[in-house]
Regions:
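S-adenosyl-L-methionine
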Residues: 1-49, 57-66, 85-113
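Conserved beta-strand/loop positions that form the S-adenosyl-L-methionine
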Residues: 51, 74
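Conserved glycine-rich SAM-binding loop
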Residues: 54
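Conserved SAM/SAH-binding beta-strand->alpha-helix loop
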Residues: 77
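A short glycine-rich, Lys/Arg-flanked "PGG" loop and its adjoining helix->strand segment in the class I
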Residues: 138-152
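Conserved beta-strand signature within the Rossmann-like core of class I S-adenosyl-L-methionine
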Residues: 152-160
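Class I S-adenosyl-L-methionine
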Residues: 165-215
């Protein structure tokens, strides 16, 4: 595990920033172990994960529209987590939770295998300068982690307004043997904050379906 991940986990475990509410913000006792999702939600239901959920606008809308499913927003920034928390409380959503941790680390280390029905990756930071490309979330390793966490035939839904980044994601997807390009499932009823902001721009979408190993 890289130093940035370790520093973040140490910060959280020190409770420098206390949890907002234990029934909404997930604060694991062990950040190195998979989450106990049944204990967190009090049931077994299909799980959708909003990677980099921002202020929670998209998260609460899809959670409200789909009470038979559970929803997890993952966000690194405290201010955005507070905003998402507030929205969940205001809407009284029993099926929505938020986890404050680095997104790539959560996917790699904290989500159990075969646990996620659908990942939403909406407008990930494109890091347009070449020297910053290594910071982009979508990499070969990211695809491996997502594949492990998805249920059979599970989906990864990616939305961006950056054509160069989109082409790079397409290239990585085409090289992967773990996913097939799928048609978009029923569009969510509410756009994300970034989708509203970039509504006048060209928006690029890609949905990848997990390919399970043949046994």
């Amino acid at each position: 595990m890289g130093d940035p991940h370790r520093r973040l986990i140490q910060m959280l475990q020190s409770r420098e920033f206390p949890a907002l509410a234990p029934d909404i913000e997930i604060v694991p006792a062990n950040y190195f172990a998979p989450l106990d999702l049944k204990s967190i939600y009090g049931r077994s239901a299909p799980l959708e994960v909003d990677l980099g959920c921002g202020d929670g606008s998209f998260l609460v809308e899809i959670a409200a529209a789909n009470p038979a499913r559970d929803f997890l927003g993952i966000e690194r920034l405290l201010g955005r987590v507070r905003s998402a928390h507030r929205k969940i409380v205001q809407r009284e959503l029993a099926n929505a939770r938020v986890l404050r941790v680095e997104t790539s680390y959560a996917v790699q280390q904290m989500l159990p295998p075969d646990s996620v029905t659908l990942f939403h990756l909406l407008f990930p930071d494109p890091w347009p300068k070449r020297r910053h490309w290594r910071r982009r979330i979508v990499t070969e390793d990211f695809f491996v982690s997502v594949h492990r966490a998805l249920v059979p035939d599970g989906l990864l839904r990616i939305v961006t307004d950056q054509i160069d980044y989109f082409r790079e994601i397409e290239r990585l997807a085409a090289q992967s043997t773990q996913f097939l390009i799928s048609s978009d499932p029923e569009p969510p009823r509410a756009p994300s904050t970034f989708e509203k902001r970039f509504s006048q721009s060209e928006i690029y979408r890609l949905v990848l379906q997990k390919v399970s190993e043949v046994t």
